[in-house]
C-alpha cells in the first residue's frame, strides 16, 4: 500500500510517520502533487495556524490536487480544520472539502489551548472508532461545531466535533499518533478502510 503524508511545512511529520510505520506500512512524506494523487491513502497532518498552512499549500500548488482526491484522506488536528470551508484562525478560506467552519473554542473558564486527554463519543456510522469513552490526546484552541458531518464529538467547555467526515475525507481533531491504543486502532482502520 502506498501511504503518503502531505508535507505542509506546518506539522510534526516524524511522529505521524513512525505511528504508521509501527503498523507495518511504508510511508512517503512529500509535497509532490503526482505522488499525492498516486497514493492509496493520504494523511494531512498539521500544527500551527490555518493561515500559514493554507499559504504553504497554495505556494506548493497543492490546493486543487487535494480537492480532487478520491482515495481515503485523513486530516489530523490542524489538518482536519484545513478540510473545512473556513477558519476563524486568521480568517482564512480552507480547502472546502467538508462544508463546516472552524471557530475558536469559547472561553468557558477552562485554559486554552485544550491540551491533554479527552474522551470521544463516536456516532454509530463512524468506521474508524467504535467504542465510546475512547481517550485521545488533544492540543487545539479552534474546533468545528457538531453538525451532520460529525462522526465523533468531545467536550471541553462546549461540545465540539472531534471527528468529521464527508465522502472520502476524514478529520480527527486529536492526535492519533499520540493517543495510544485508540489512536493506533484508528490509524489501522483508516489504512484498511474500503470506501463504498
Curated annotation (Swiss-Prot):
InterPro entries in UniProt: Class_I_gatase-like, GATASE, Imidazole-glycPsynth_HisH
Keyword Cytoplasm in record: yes
CDD domains per record: GATase1_IGP_Synthase
Keyword Lyase in annotation: yes
Domain Glutamine amidotransferase type-1 per the UniProt entry, residue ranges: 2-196
Entry GO terms, CC: cytoplasm
A Pfam family: GATase
EC number(s) on file: 4.3.2.10, 3.5.1.2
Pathway where this protein functions: Amino-acid biosynthesis; L-histidine biosynthesis; L-histidine from 5-phospho-alpha-D-ribose 1-diphosphate: step 5/9
Example GO biological process: L-histidine biosynthetic process
Active site (UniProt): 77, 175, 177
UniProt GO MF annotations: glutaminase activity; imidazoleglycerol-phosphate synthase activity; lyase activity
Keywords tagged on the record: Amino-acid biosynthesis, Cytoplasm, Glutamine amidotransferase, Histidine biosynthesis, Hydrolase, Lyase
Catalytic activity: 5-[(5-phospho-1-deoxy-D-ribulos-1-ylimino)methylamino]-1-(5-phospho-beta-D-ribosyl)imidazole-4-carboxamide + L-glutamine = D-erythro-1-(imidazol-4-yl)glycerol 3-phosphate + 5-amino-1-(5-phospho-beta-D-ribosyl)imidazole-4-carboxamide + L-glutamate + H(+); L-glutamine + H2O = L-glutamate + NH4(+)
Localisation: Cytoplasm
Major localization class: cytoplasm
PANTHER family noted in UniProt: IMIDAZOLE GLYCEROL PHOSPHATE SYNTHASE SUBUNIT HISH
Physiological role: IGPS catalyzes the conversion of PRFAR and glutamine to IGP, AICAR and glutamate. The HisH subunit catalyzes the hydrolysis of glutamine to glutamate and ammonia as part of the synthesis of IGP and AICAR. The resulting ammonia molecule is channeled to the active site of HisF.
Quaternary structure (record): Heterodimer of HisH and HisF.
Name this protein carries in UniProt: Imidazole glycerol phosphate synthase subunit HisH
Originating organism: Idiomarina loihiensis (strain ATCC BAA-735 / DSM 15497 / L2-TR)
Origin organism lineage: Bacteria, Pseudomonadati, Pseudomonadota, Gammaproteobacteria, Alteromonadales
Amino acid at each position: 500500500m502506498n501511504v503518503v503524508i502531505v508535507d505542509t511545512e506546518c506539522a510534526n511529520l516524524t511522529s505521524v510517520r513512525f505511528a504508521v510505520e509501527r503498523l507495518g506500512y511504508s510511508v512517503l512524506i512529500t509535497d509532490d502533487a503526482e505522488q499525492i494523487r498516486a497514493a492509496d491513502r493520504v494523511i494531512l497532518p498539521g500544527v500551527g495556524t490555518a493561515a500559514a498552512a493554507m499559504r504553504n499549500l497554495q505556494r506548493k500548488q497543492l490546493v486543487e490536487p487535494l480537492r480532487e482526491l478520491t482515495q481515503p484522506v485523513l486530516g489530523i488536528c490542524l489538518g482536519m480544520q484545513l478540510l473545512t470551508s473556513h477558519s476563524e484562525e486568521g480568517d482564512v478560506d480552507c480547502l472546502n472539502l467538508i462544508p463546516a467552519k472552524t471557530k475558536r473554542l469559547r472561553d468557558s473558564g477552562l485554559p486554552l489551548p485544550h491540551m491533554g486527554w479527552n474522551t470521544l463519543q463516536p456516532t454509530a456510522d463512524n468506521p474508524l472508532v467504535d467504542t465510546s469513552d475512547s481517550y485521545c490526546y488533544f492540543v487545539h484552541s479552534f474546533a468545528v461545531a457538531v453538525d451532520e458531518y460529525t462522526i465523533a464529538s468531545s467536550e471541553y467547555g462546549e461540545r465540539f466535533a472531534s471527528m468529521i467526515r464527508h465522502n472520502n475525507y476524514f478529520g480527527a481533531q486529536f492526535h492519533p499518533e499520540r493517543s495510544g491504543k485508540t489512536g493506533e486502532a484508528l490509524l489501522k482502520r483508516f489504512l484498511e478502510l474500503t470506501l463504498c
